Design a protein with these regions (language model features):
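N-terminal Rossmann-like NAD(P) cofactor-binding subdomain of oxidoreductases
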Residues: 1-184
Length: 184
């Protein structure tokens, strides 16, 4: 958080023009910035890395513009998590518009790929379900304690990671005491 607090600017399309500490009250007294509008073309020499937290299917529009300025990117969307274009298009149902970068993207799981992440130009941050599934599986697979086709992942998640836009499926009165299948 100290690095975030020392940044010269921060961008949030949804909150452009609003004070950071008004949107994120826990930062009150620590940061004196307003959220700015994203101007990709003017990033140039201002930044070394962009942490891109945009919806899935949007990052692939921004990443080429950012990388063409030789700026490193950490992408929180799913757009670069898979390094195979055909697999991505099968799972997400859309064409990937920047497939040439997919094979060279580093999967941002530091417990597994720490050294590769350090030197990466594009890091695909893993999602919560893959992280929950991969981390406990690494030692049991490495030690050959289980057959790969015998692994069952039964993961549950709260609604806090579902984004800030209200939806019937994430509205607390509709979710409280309910279990909803994800991604079926």
């Amino acid at each position: 958080i100290q690095r975030f607090l020392s940044q010269p600017f921060t961008v949030a399309e949804t909150f452009t023009g609003q004070r950071v500490d008004r949107v994120l009250p826990n930062l009150r007294g620590f940061i004196d910035l307003d959220f700015e509008k994203l101007e990709i073309q003017s990033l140039g020499n201002q930044v070394d890395v962009v942490i891109l937290a945009v919806p899935h299917k949007v990052a692939m529009e921004f990443v080429p513009q950012i990388r063409n300025q030789d700026i490193r990117v950490i992408d929180f969307s799913a757009d670069y998590r898979l390094n195979n274009q055909l697999v991505y298009e099968k799972w997400y149902g859309i064409d990937h518009t920047d497939p040439s970068r997919m094979p060279n993207t580093i999967y941002g799981l530091p417990e597994r790929y720490r050294d590769l992440i350090r030197g990466a130009d594009l890091v695909a941050n893993p999602g919560c379900y893959p992280t929950t599934s991969i981390l406990p599986s690494i030692p049991i697979i490495s030690e050959q304690l289980v057959e790969l086709d015998q692994i069952i992942i039964d993961a549950k998640s709260g609604i806090s990671g579902a984004g800030s836009k209200p939806k019937d499926t994430t509205h607390y009165p509709n979710r409280e005491s309910n279990l909803v299948a994800y991604g079926l």
